[in-house]
């Protein structure tokens, strides 16, 4: 009898443990109700007609041949921006690894305003046999009011493509490669392996600076099939600090005035080696403590991520590493700054409506593969602790239902139905093939750290290998219980894709955010938002008097239900997807004729902190951020109502209003 009681107790205990470990699952009716709020139409991205043959793997250094599919797993990237100056972020700049081309084109469905064209660096030197583009940034790098582009590569340093001042748009002229002048960011012909980049005013002088994140060590020959020797990989699986450097560039006034020119000064030794040489895959910049100096989040492969507190002054860069605190119930790897996961994507957003930015980070969370955990670093609000070196964040991904999905790269937070609550999405997938190589990768994960740096000891990851090559990109929506649920299946977003970057923008000005996924070794797609019955919204194009996007400007507002919303003009946060430099708030059931009080904070182009409170009716507004001191509006309490549009421009589904002090 006792024998049977013991067996029964073991069965009951196992059943209880199983029930406790299962994730809550909504009913089919509840899932259908969540999915009914959203609808997206998929369109392939345009290509140039002479793009050449597709390839499915890169030529690599001979010592890396056995892992050529692994080395070839990055490169797809996309940026959404207003490149042609029509007032809408309806232009694409994307990288297709199948052709190694950087293509600029109108977003599908936004009229054929110009023919797609390739952004090649000629006449600058670029060896196509050993170089590959990895991503792009859009920004006004010479502060002339025109949108420029930056392309970063494996095998060379980044290139600036500066827009010429021309009669484009006034007499039938169209945007083309001839409108851009290629310029070196760095002279000297060094070999960099850049995986990500971000722009922000790092030192608070009022000008936007650049941070380039490299993956493989600087000077390597990763894509040179004729090189000798043996390339070095990560020095360990959980604390690899031998990767490429993070390079910081401070903006400088250009010396040339009669042609497009930009000048940046590289500042050395800004970071310690522990920060500077992680194997970086994603970076983000956002003001997290309210001083309008951007903190930096650096997401690293094979090692801990880094959150850096910005303590800089104009011309003097200074950052301090922040680390989280651990209690009895928190695993070490779920403490900020102590994780050993594979950070691959990062985004900022206020997930709980408390008026503070939280941090969403992608890692690897593959069932039957490598189940780490994604991070949702929820702000505790104790921002004063940053001065003590403490990161005031706790990991809430498991509680919120955002800890698991797949082999994830880009992480994104955005409000796609304008209800005032952010949705979450990720780009997933690693290597697509027919032979499951997870057992071999798991064996590598349990091997001695002393051999991981040598590619001879790695498993066979050549073409044909499969590592999470059939993942679907998740689309998480918050349920009534406060948890997030993946509704990709009922939405029809179930085609497996090996995705890397996600770019978000309202490409047609209708108030509904659209997105583009950049896919590795496959076609990339626009997902046009056709969601029914969306709420009201407030959209802000915040610009300086010269027309440059006010990167780093912060907007805040409150909703009747008590939620506080905050967002910033983003300068490229993420892995390889770049959202447009706009601010978008979903307002829910707000009356569309009722003004919204919004508070804007920014640094002007002299580096002085400015605040301005104004009222705007829902819709898109372009707000020129002038020096409010000269207008006698020096505090947020001095409210100013902005009355209707000084001028308006018709756009598909909406009106773009321009408002000025």
State what each model feature region is.
Residues 191-211, 339-435, 497-499, 503-535, ...:
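Repeat-solenoid scaffold signature
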């Amino acid at each position: 009898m006792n024998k049977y009681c013991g067996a029964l107790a073991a069965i009951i205990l196992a059943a209880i443990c199983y029930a406790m470990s299962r994730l809550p699952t909504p009913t089919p009716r509840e899932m259908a109700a969540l999915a009914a709020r959203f609808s997206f139409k998929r369109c392939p991205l345009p290509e140039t007609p002479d793009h050449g043959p597709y390839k499915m793997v890169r030529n690599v250094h001979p010592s890396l041949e056995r892992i050529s599919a692994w080395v070839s797993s990055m490169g797809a990237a996309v940026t959404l921006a207003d490149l042609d100056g029509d007032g809408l972020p309806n232009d694409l700049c994307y990288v297709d690894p199948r052709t190694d081309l950087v293509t600029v084109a109108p977003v599908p469905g936004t009229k054929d305003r110009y023919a797609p064209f390739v952004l090649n660096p000629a006449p600058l030197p670029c060896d196509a046999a050993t170089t590959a583009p990895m991503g792009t940034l859009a920004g006004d790098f010479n502060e002339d009011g025109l949108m420029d582009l930056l392309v970063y590569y494996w095998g060379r340093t980044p290139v600036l493509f500066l827009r010429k001042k021309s009669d484009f748009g006034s007499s039938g002229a169209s945007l083309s490669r001839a409108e851009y002048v290629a310029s070196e960011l760095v002279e000297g012909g060094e070999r960099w392996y850049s995986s990500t980049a971000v722009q922000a005013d790092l030192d608070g002088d009022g000008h936007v600076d650049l941070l380039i994140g490299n993956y493989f060590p600087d000077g390597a020959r990763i894509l040179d099939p004729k090189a000798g020797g043996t390339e070095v990989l990560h020095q360990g699986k959980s604390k690899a600090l031998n990767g490429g450097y993070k390079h910081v560039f401070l903006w400088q006034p250009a010396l040339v005035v009669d042609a497009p020119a930009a000048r940046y000064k590289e500042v050395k030794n800004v970071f310690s080696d522990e920060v500077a040489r992680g194997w970086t895959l994603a970076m983000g910049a956002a003001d997290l403590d309210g001083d309008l100096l951007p903190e930096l989040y650096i997401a690293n492969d094979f090692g801990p991520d880094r959150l850096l507190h910005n303590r800089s002054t104009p011309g003097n860069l200074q950052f301090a590493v922040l680390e989280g605190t651990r209690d009895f119930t928190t695993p070490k790897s779920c403490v900020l700054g102590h994780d050993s996961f594979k950070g691959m994507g990062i985004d900022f957003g206020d997930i709980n409506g408390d008026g503070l930015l939280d941090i969403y980070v992608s890692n690897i969370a593959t069932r039957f593969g490598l189940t780490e955990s994604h991070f949702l670093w929820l702000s505790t609000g104790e921002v004063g602790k940053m001065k003590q070196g403490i990161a005031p964040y706790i990991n809430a991904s498991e509680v919120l239902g955002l800890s698991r999905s797949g082999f994830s790269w880009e992480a994104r937070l955005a409000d796609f139905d304008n209800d005032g609550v952010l949705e979450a999405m990720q780009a997933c997938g690693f290597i697509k093939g027919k032979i499951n190589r997870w057992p071999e990768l798991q064996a590598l994960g349990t091997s001695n750290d002393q051999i991981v740096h040598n590619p001879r000891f790695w498993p066979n990851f050549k073409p044909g290998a499969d590592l999470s090559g059939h993942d679907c990109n998740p689309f998480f929506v918050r349920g009534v219980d406060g948890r997030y649920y993946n509704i990709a299946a009922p939405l029809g977003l179930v085609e497996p894709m090996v995705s890397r970057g996600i770019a978000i923008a309202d490409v047609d000005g209708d108030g509904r955010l659209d997105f583009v996924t950049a896919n590795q070794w496959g076609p990339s797609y626009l997902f046009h938002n056709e969601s029914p019955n969306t709420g009201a919204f407030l959209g802000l194009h915040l610009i300086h008097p010269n027309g440059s996007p006010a990167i780093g400007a912060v907007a805040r507002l409150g909703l009747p239900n008590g939620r506080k919303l905050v967002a910033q003009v983003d300068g490229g946060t993420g892995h390889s997807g770049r959202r447009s430099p706009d601010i978008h708030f979903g307002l829910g059931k707000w009356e569309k004729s009722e003004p919204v009080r919004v508070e804007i904070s920014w640094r002007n182009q002299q580096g002085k902190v400015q605040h301005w409170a104004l009222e705007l009716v829902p819709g898109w507004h372009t707000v020129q951020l002038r020096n409010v001191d000269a207008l006698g509006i020096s505090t947020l309490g001095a409210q100013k109502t902005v009355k209707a549009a000084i001028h308006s421009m018709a756009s598909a589904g909406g009106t773009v209003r321009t408002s000025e002090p």
